[in-house]
Each structure stands twice: as C-alpha cells, then as structure tokens.
C-alpha cells in the first residue's frame, strides 16, 4: 500500500511537485467549493504595490495570511481570499517620473496629465506575474484571478461613496494647515506617512539674528535653525514666564534682549556684557520690531512684526526668543490667533522661492540658506552662526528632506470622532496584545486631523465641484450623480478624464472640480467597501461579512492601513473594520540594518526557497521574534537550522514508519483501535489528543507563537521519546499484537500530526499525507477537517508521569555528561531523591524506562539525601545580617561548625539553637546556605525538589557491557556505510582478540539482536575494519550480508 520513501530528499524539488499536484487537480478551488454555503470567515488582504518585487518583509504577513485562512477552511468556514493591488499614489507616480526623466509638477503638466496617467496605468501592474509566482511558491493559497485594484471603476466609485458619506456627516473640511510636504513629489503628506519614512541626523545652520525694536536702538536676539524661513518672518515669540535680560554688549556697544539662562552660552566671559534690566517675557508682549526684509512690510497693518508669548518657547537651547514664520505648525497657529496677516507662502510647488522674494527667486529653499545668511551678514543682522545636529524627517518615497509649509488641503476631522476611535480599538483583539493600549492606542489618543488630499495626478480625484462664482460646493458620491448633473456618460473617474467635466451653475458661474486627488491610504482604508462595490452591489450581503474576522500586516501599518481602516469603519458605521489582527515586526539583515538591494545585505528570498524550501522558511519566520511584532535579524543559517532540526526530523519519523510498514506489509484500516495497553502508546495518543485541544484553542485566539511551541514540543516527544523507545517493537521479527499496536499508534499519530501541521507547512504535510491516506479519504490533506480532540483518550495523569520521568532522565543524563560518563557505559545504581510520594510512585512505575535510558542496573528511590551527600553550611548574611548585629561573625563561624546531623535537623524543618555571649539564636533553613559534598564514588546533582546520584564505580562486567554497546554502535555505522537495508541480516566477523572474545562470550545474543547478525565468527581475513572501542582498545571486525 505504501510507496517506498528515500531517507534523503531535496525538499524544494518535492515542493515543486506538490505545486504541480495542486494546480493540476485544482485543489485550492476544490477547498473553496466544498465550503460554499458554510459560515463565512471574512479576511481582508491589504493591497501591496505591484511596482516592486516581494521581499522578506512581505513573506512574513503572507505566511500568516495563509496559515489562518487554511486553518479556518479546515474548520469548516467559507474563507474567500481575494488578492488586491494598490495601484494609485505617490509610489507609482514617482516610478513614472523617473522612467520619463520628468522633474516636478510643471514638467508633468507640460508632458500632459492624460499621457502621464496612461504611463502610470501601464506600469502599475508591472510585477503582478512575479508576485503571483513568488507568493504561490511560498505556498500561499489566494485568488489572484478575482482580484481587486484601486484603479478599477467600481472600486473608485465606492471610494467616492465613502468620501461623500463622511462629507455629509460633517467630517470632511478644507483648510490651510502647515503640513509635511515633499518637494520632489510636490504634494503634502499625512502625519502617519511621515512616520513611514526615516528620521536622519543632519546638520543645519543655527543662526542667532538681531531684530531691531521699532523706534529704539535695541535688538532682540532670536534663534532659528531654518534660515530659509527668515524672509517670511512675521512675528517673534517669547515665553510668558521666562526671565529675560537687557544687556549692553561691551565690545559691540549694542543693547540686546536675551533669555537670562542663555547668557552664559553667548558670553563665556561675564565682563563682556552688562545687565541693565531684567523682566519676564510678558513684559515684551505687543512690542513692535523692524522686519529683516521689506518683502512683506505691508503686513504690519494686519498685526505683523510684533512680539507674542508662546508656551513652546524654552531656554533649553537658542536664546529663549524664537522667530515666527508661517512654515511651522505652532508658528502658524500663533499668527492665526493673534494677527490678520495674509497667507504668506512665497514658494512654488517645488519649494522654490517665487518673485515675491526677489533676492532669492528660483532657489530651492534649503539651497537658499547660505545666500540668506550672507545677506543678513551684509546687513549686520547676523549675531552668531553655529551648526545644529538634529533628527529630521525624510520622504518615504524620494528619500529627500521634507519641508513644513502651509497649504490648502482636505481633511478628515479626527478630533470629532476620536473618542469613537478609541472605543473601536477596544473591540479589536490585537496580537501581540500590548499594541492595543500601546503603539496603536497611544497613536489614536494623539491622532490629528487627517490630510487626505494630494496635489498629484494618478489617484482617485476628490469628488467635489466648486462654483467658480460663489464657491458653492457639490460633493458627488456616484457615477449616476455625476452623469445627472453633467449630462455626460462616465466610464473613467481618473483626473485626466473628469477634470474636463463641468456644468453651469444657476448662480452664473461654472462648476469645476477641485484639483486634488485622494491620498492612496484613503483608498486602502476603503477596501472593505470598495472591493465589494458597496453600496452599489449586494448591499444586503455586506453586513454579513463586515467587520472582517481577521487581518494581518506589519508593525508599520499601525500608523497606516490599520489606522485608516479604523478611521473609516468608525466614521461610517461606528464600529471597527476588523475584529482580530496579527502584527509582525520588521525583518532586518543579519547585522541589524534595513535590508537593501543596493547594499546587497541579504539573500534573494527565492534563492532561499530553492535551497531550503518554502516550508523551512515559513517555519523560520513564524518561530521568530517577528511574529511578536519584534524585529528579526534574518539569517540564512536560521532557515537551514529549521530544515535540519524540524523538517528533516519530521521526514525521518515518517520514513521510519514507512520503511518498517512496507517490510511488515502493514495495512491501516479506516478504523484504528486507539485503546491500547502499551504505556507508550497510551501516552503518545493522550499527548496528540491534548495537542489537538491546545492547538484549536490557541489558533482560535490567533496565538501562532504558542501554537508553534506546542507543535515543536510534540514533534520532539514523538521522535526522541516515542519512536526511539519503540524501535525494538518495529524491529522484532514476530508480528504480534504489540507490534500491530505500535504500527497503528504511529500511523494514527503521524496522520493527525500532518493534519495539524498542514496550515503551517502545507508542502511537506501534503507529501506525507498522499502516502498515508487510505483509498476513501480526501484527495488532499487540505480538503480535510482540522482534527478535533477525543477527550476520553486524554490521560493527563499519564502525561504528567511521563513528563516527570523524562525530566528525571534529562537531569541524570546531564549529570553523566558533566562528568564525561558516556551513556553507553552502564553504571550500577541511580539514586533518585524526592519527598513527593506521587513522584516516588511514578518512579517505581517507570523504573524499567529509567534504567534503560540512564543505562543503570538498579534504581533506589529515597526521601532523603543522606546516602548520597554530607552537608556543610555557611551563614546567609543577607538573611542574618539585620538581626545579629555585632555577633554576626561569631554566629557565622558557629554555622560552619554545624555537624551533618545538625544540618539534617534544620533541613527537616526544625530549628537549631546557637548560643553566643549568653544570646541564643534559632537558626532555620533560610538562615544558611547549603553545601552538598558527594560521598565516595557518587556523582550528585540537585534540581528543584529532585536530587539524583549516580554510582560511578565500574566493575569488569559493567566495563565489558559498555564495550559491547560501543561495538554495536560501530557495527550499525558500518552497516550504513555499506548501504545495507535496515532488514538485511549479516554475518559479523571478528579478529581473535582477548577483550573482544570476553565481550562476545558475555553479550553474544544482545549483540546479534541489535545488529541483525545471524552469527558471529572469528575470521582474521574478513575482519579488516579497525575500530576503537575505548581509548586503549582497538579491534578488527567485518560484516557481510547474509544471502539466505
């Protein structure tokens, strides 16, 4: 029934074969079809950009997004998995700009927006075939055919509906704000887009400027790190309660006003200035000063060029006096609150000075810094120049510094719904949990209004038309609305098409669309609705699949997709858009740096899959810190270790079973009797039923970390305990009930383990299942139901007994290893000390197993350690110091002189009285530090409540037995080297050696049984292989396959 299995297998090739099987037999499609009409499990797939290839950062969420849907499908749910593509926005435009060698908004407009958008449309799906190939090779099942794209007409129309719904609720408004702005892209960014970029350490000029007070020969010393904003200076800010000094500069003979605490920074020599007056900042409020430049002197009659008080001013650096221009958010708010100045923004879309600032016209603002400094120096207004090192945000797409500037933009009013957003967050199950109140929760608490408009071209246009005469606005929520108002057929909603659509206003003007497009994050946040063309299609069905049961993405999406989903879900329906989310961390290169193609600091992921297999990579990622939203320093060796320590051991367990099942012609029945008599069978069956219970509970809670932990623990128990302890049951020649029980138990265990592992490592489990399944079973492992626990087969008491037994054996083996006593060398006695009667009974029940595993002849179970150790004691100064005072040294000395019997009395819970200088002290166990001293020929170890001792006195009989075991190991290795089959019987030849003769005389039957030798013959001519049995003992042996 079973196909022969090779011990060595190339897993990537095996996976390619399984992919062909899935494709040829349409297994994914069948898995979906068989769940039609079942309970829906809603999963949202966040849309990636297809303008680049997937990397390790994509592999983590894509693995998670495969595990959970596979599991839920096996649980009987209908899990639709539609891939999506983010096709609009800055990433696409930036790629096209580079390919067309265009620079900036003006050149794009000259090239033609219609042609530019067509180029965007052409490249936006450039790598979809590669994405499909790579994600499929990873083992992920997802529907690429029925995908959604944010540029689809139906998707864009639903986004308009979302926008209009928010607009009608009063949550959308247009206003001037100071926003982070990308000069190269010529568009503002939202505050969370800024966080997607990098903050870099940069040096900027730090200037102290002299502002002359109006009608006085006195100067304010103001500080700035943005010289380019000085031409638009409209005010000065001081701290209301900060102390200021008016000083005479003795060298320059000028009068300056400066924050008192900052005097020592500017004047290291106190003799260089004289303080003539001191006052609080409130005293300066309202004072006028002379503008540095004459560009905007006309703003004086609107409140410009005055001193204001502001809370953000400090004396931590600078002068305690700050210049105000409308290019900082706080500055802008002060001007807005205290003046009626015009919106002064003399820079163009690419942040170059316009003709309003004639001295620097055409210069990029940052490039103008030095010229502005030279100008101020020539005007004798530069007091001091320094360099200032600080962290500054860079554009996440162009890697160029952002500029903060006032700009007209459209916003979602987050302040209005902030409390609702916080309540929505309470409904979400975050994995890991700390994100709810931590990173995401705090982000919500401090969330600002969301700038959703972009001054770009390839995006979903903001659906607002304004009357050219009155400014009256009409918000459009569907194609039908636009067609009725314009009288034109709408077949494309992109900017180059609908900007041409206008209609006359009843007020005499014309309705023209506002020029901006939507932030692509608004589109991805609309994905739950737009991917279903809600509310234009299947409106009634939508409520059954919203919110999503599950989503998964990287940690950066706490300020991206997770955030926009939450905003729009709350704004539209006052509920979160998803119930459960698994958040992964970042995958970094092995040196902890960001993975970079240019630095070539990581291996191509496809090369990793082709070397180690996708299953190994999937497990490596899921087992790593990245699954807990922590960073992972990726290494190829880590994937290799997973292959070596997990994938191959699973294969070996399977290979072991198949090898002997074929030899013994074992044929499994559809029904397996699981009520076994052998303690190992009962134990492993109980363990796998417990595993089913735990896995179902943990995966239902989306706890993949715990799920993997218990799976790996079980694999270790299966391989290194059950199979290892049961080998002789499979080897023996007679097919008795015990052997049949072993086959049935291992078969049942392997098949159920494969079913449980299937969502995690879909390739290997499919391969093994195909050989294990019986005639009437499902075509693929992934068409099966997920295993459910048979409660009556769980024996917790037996599991605890076996776990305790294994713990004792592990401690004893560690003791042997620490004293270089090889496990093949038998010892006479193992002593196990525990006061716990339940543990003592377990040890008696498991005596045979313990003796075999420790290679000991007898076991002695005791309640006390007296037979193993003698005791010495030292004073516990930490405990005694506070209560003994001056007698501390004397008591400590007395404790070192306590007898073994005295210490035993203390160990048994009694007090021991020590008298010093007529003072008595009751000494208890916590007052002393115990030292155990091993008795002769004993090696002792203590761990928790267990003490183990090994009698290391080796008799000649024990010595010979140890050599026999070493001989058996060497023969087994020789069988492997000779490529003998595991069932091949052999003739074992030996030389005429005195020690070897003794070994054979004492242990002949044991050696024959273990090596499958039918006879052992002395034949010096055929015993040509020299083996070392011990450091001083070499023997010659030979083996020959028996042909009978």
Curated annotation (Swiss-Prot):
Keyword flag Protein biosynthesis: yes
Cofactor(s), names only, from the UniProt record: Zn(2+)
Primary location recorded for the protein, binned into one broad class: cytoplasm
Motif mapping: 'KMSKS' region: 594-598
Keyword ATP-binding among UniProt keywords: yes
Motif segment ('HIGH' region): 48-58
Gene3D superfamilies: HUPs (3.40.50.620), Isoleucyl-tRNA Synthetase, Domain 1 (1.10.730.10)
Location of the protein in the cell: Cytoplasm
UniProt keyword annotations, A-Z: Aminoacyl-tRNA synthetase, ATP-binding, Cytoplasm, Ligase, Metal-binding, Nucleotide-binding, Protein biosynthesis, Zinc
A GO term from the CC aspect: cytoplasm
EC number: 6.1.1.5
Family from the record: Belongs to the class-I aminoacyl-tRNA synthetase family. IleS type 2 subfamily.
UniProt protein name: Isoleucine--tRNA ligase
Lineage, highest ranks first: Bacteria, Pseudomonadati, Spirochaetota, Spirochaetia, Spirochaetales
This protein's encoding gene: ileS
């Amino acid at each position: 029934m079973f196909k022969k299995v090779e011990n060595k297998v190339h897993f990537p090739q095996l996976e390619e074969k399984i992919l062909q099987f899935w494709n040829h037999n349409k297994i994914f499609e069948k898995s979906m079809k068989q769940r039609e009409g079942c309970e829906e499990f809603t999963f949202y797939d966040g849309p990636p950009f297809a303008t680049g290839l997937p990397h390790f950062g994509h592999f983590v969420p894509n693995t998670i997004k495969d595990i959970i849907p596979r599991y839920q499908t096996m649980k009987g749910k209908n899990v639709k998995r539609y891939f999506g593509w983010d096709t609009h926005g800055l990433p696409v435009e930036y790629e096209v700009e580079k390919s067309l060698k265009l620079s900036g908004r003006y050149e794009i407009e000259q090239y033609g927006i219609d042609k530019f958008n067509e180029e965007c449309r052409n490249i936006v799906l450039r790598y979809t075939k590669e994405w499909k190939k790579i994600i499929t090779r990873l083992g992920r099942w997802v529907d690429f055919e029925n995908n959604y794209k944010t540029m689809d007409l139906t998707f864009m129309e639903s986004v308009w509906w979302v926008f209009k719904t928010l607009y009608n609720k009063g949550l959308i408004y247009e206003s001037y704000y100071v926003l982070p702005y990308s000069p190269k892209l010529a568009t503002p960014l939202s505050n969370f887009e800024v966080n997607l970029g990098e903050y870099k350490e940069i040096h900027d000029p730090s200037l102290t400027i002299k502002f002359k007070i109006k009608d006085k020969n006195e100067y304010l010393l103001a500080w700035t790190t943005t010289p380019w904003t000085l031409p638009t200076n409209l005010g000065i800010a001081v701290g209301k309660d900060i102390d200021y000094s008016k000083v005479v500069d003795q060298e320059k003979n000028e009068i300056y006003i400066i924050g008192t605490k900052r005097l020592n920074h500017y004047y290291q020599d106190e003799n260089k200035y004289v303080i003539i007056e001191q006052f609080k900042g409130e005293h300066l409020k309202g004072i006028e000063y002379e503008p540095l430049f004459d560009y905007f002197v006309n703003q004086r009659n609107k409140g410009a060029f005055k001193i204001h008080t502001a809370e953000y001013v400090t004396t931590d650096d600078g002068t305690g006096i700050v210049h105000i221009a409308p290019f900082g958010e706080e500055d802008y708010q002060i001007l807005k609150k205290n003046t009626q100045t015009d919106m002064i923004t003399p820079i163009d879309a690419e942040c170059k000075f316009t003709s309003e600032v004639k001295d620097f016209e055409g210069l990029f603002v940052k490039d103008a810094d030095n010229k502005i400094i030279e100008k101020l120096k020539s005007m004798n207004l530069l007091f001091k120049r320094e360099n200032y090192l600080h962290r500054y945000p860079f554009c996440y797409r162009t890697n160029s510094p952002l500029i903060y500037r006032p700009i007209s933009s459209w916003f979602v009013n987050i302040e209005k719904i902030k409390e609702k957003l916080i309540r929505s967050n309470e409904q979400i199950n975050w994995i890991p949990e700390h994100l709810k109140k931590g990173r995401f929760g705090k982000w919500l608490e401090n969330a600002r209004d969301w700038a959703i408009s972009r001054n770009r071209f390839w995006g979903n246009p903001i659906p607002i038309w304004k009357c050219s005469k009155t400014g009256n606005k009409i918000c459009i929520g569907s194609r039908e609305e636009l067609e009725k108002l314009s009288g034109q057929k709408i077949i494309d909603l992109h900017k180059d098409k609908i900007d041409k659509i206008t209609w006359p206003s009843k007020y005499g003007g014309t309705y023209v669309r506002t020029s901006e497009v939507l932030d692509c994050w608004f589109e991805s946040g609309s994905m739950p609705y737009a991917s279903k063309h809600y509310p234009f299609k299947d409106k009634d069905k939508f409520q059954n699949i919203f919110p999503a049961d599950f989503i998964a993405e990287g940690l950066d999406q706490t300020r991206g997709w997770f955030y926009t989903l939450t905003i729009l879900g709350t704004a539209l329906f006052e509920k979160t858009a998803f119930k459960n989310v698994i958040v992964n961390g970042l995958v970094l290169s092995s040196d902890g740096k960001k993975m970079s193609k240019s630095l070539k600091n990581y291996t191509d992921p496809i090369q990793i899959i082709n070397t180690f297999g996708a299953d190994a990579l999937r497990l490596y990622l899921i087992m790593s810190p990245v699954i807990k939203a922590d960073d992972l320093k990726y290494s190829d060796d880590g994937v290799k270790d997973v292959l070596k320590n997990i994938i191959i051991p699973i294969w070996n367990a399977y290979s072991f079973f198949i090898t002997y099942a074929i030899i013994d012609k074992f044929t499994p029945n559809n029904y397996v009797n699981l009520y076994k008599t052998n303690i190992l069978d009962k134990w492993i069956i109980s363990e796998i039923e417990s595993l089913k219970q735990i896995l179902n509970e943990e995966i239902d809670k989306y706890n993949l970390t715990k799920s993997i932990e218990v799976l790996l623990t079980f694999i270790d128990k299966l391989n290194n305990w059950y199979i290892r302890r049961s080998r002789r049951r499979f080897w023996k020649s007679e097919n008795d009930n015990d052997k049949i029980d072993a086959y049935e138990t291992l078969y049942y265990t392997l098949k159920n383990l494969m079913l449980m592992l299937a969502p995690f490592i879909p390739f290997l489990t499919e391969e093994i299942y195909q050989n294990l399944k019986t005639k009437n079973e499902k075509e693929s492992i992934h068409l099966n139901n997920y295993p459910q626990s048979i409660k009556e087969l769980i024996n917790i008491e037996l599991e605890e007994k076996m776990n305790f037994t294994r713990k004792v054996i592990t401690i004893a083996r560690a003791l042997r290893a620490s004293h270089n006593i090889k496990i093949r060398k038998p010892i006479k006695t193992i002593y196990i000390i525990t006061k716990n009667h339940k543990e003592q009974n377990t040890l008696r029940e498991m005596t045979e197993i313990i003796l075999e595993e420790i290679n000991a002849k007898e076991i002695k179970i005791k309640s006390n350690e007296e037979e193993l150790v003698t005791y010495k004691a030292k004073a516990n100064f930490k405990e005694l110091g506070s209560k003994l005072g001056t007698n501390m040294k004397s008591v400590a000395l007395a404790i070192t002189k306590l007898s073994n019997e005295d210490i035993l009395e203390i160990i048994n819970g009694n007090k021991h009285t020590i008298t010093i200088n007529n003072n008595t002290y009751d000494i208890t166990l916590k007052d002393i530090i115990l030292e155990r001293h091993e008795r002769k020929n004993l090696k002792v170890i203590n761990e928790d409540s267990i003490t183990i001792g090994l009698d290391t006195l080796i008799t000649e009989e024990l010595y010979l037995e140890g050599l026999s075991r070493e001989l058996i190991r060497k023969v087994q290795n020789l069988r492997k080297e000779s490529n003998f089959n595991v069932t091949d019987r052999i003739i074992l030849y030996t030389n005429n050696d005195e020690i070897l003769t003794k070994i054979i005389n004492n242990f002949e039957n044991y050696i024959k049984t273990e090596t499958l030798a039918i006879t052992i013959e002395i034949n010096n001519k055929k015993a040509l292989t020299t083996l070392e049995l011990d450091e001083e003992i070499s023997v010659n042996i030979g083996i020959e396959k028996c042909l009978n």
